[in-house]
Amino acid sequence: GGFHICPPGWNCELSNRNHFRAWGMEAKGWMIVETGSAAGLDGSIAKAAERGENWFGYYWSPTAIIGKYNMQAVDMGEYAGKDNWDNCLSKPEQECANPLKSSWVKSEVYSVATDNFKQTAGKEGMSYLEKRTYPGPVMNGMLVWMGENQAEGADAAIEFLKTQEDVWTKWVSKSAAKKIKKAL
């Protein structure tokens, strides 16, 4: 098989190469597939999907291509720790003698607000920010919709409110949800 890795010069190229070694993929008959660029990586996914072929490699989310082709993450087990990640997996191969098998670092996204916003938003506004979360498949799907419709953010917001009621109504009060639905 082939493991499609990040384009040259991207930080994820380093961790891709070290994951390849940690999992002993070469000894199992795998090879690294270098796509050369972000467009090349995207093209490799599209080509495989259009041919009905499997594709294995690194990609991030949320993105339209993940949503368009309904790609699934491979379970790579437990995260092997910050030391393994920072001092080995994320380094050039010559600086990472013994990479350990590891899942990826989990990226967390936070909403932040100024004191002024907190005061003017009130309890209901802050409650909304605390509850708001976009499930990955929903975000990927919205990015696909935006690309296919050449839509701007404002258009996507309306589409989201119309099609993802089960998601956003959990973020707001019943009275706010009723007003939003009426406005749509």
Annotate each language-model stretch with its function.
Residues H4, W10, D86, P92-Q94:
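Extracellular secreted precursors and ectodomains with disulfide-bonded cysteine-rich loops/domains
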Residues A48-W85:
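A ligand-binding cleft/hinge motif common to bilobed small-molecule-binding domains
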Residues G1-A27, M31-S44, R51, G136, ...:
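Bilobed "Venus flytrap"/periplasmic-binding protein-like clamshell domains
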Residues K106-A121, M142-W145:
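A bilobed periplasmic-binding-protein/Venus flytrap-type ligand-binding module shared by bacterial periplasmic
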Residues P8-C12, S37-G40, S61-I66, A80, ...:
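Solvent-exposed loop/turn segments at secondary-structure junctions
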Residues R21-M25, A46-E50, E130-Y134, G147, ...:
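Sec-exported extracytoplasmic/periplasmic mature domains
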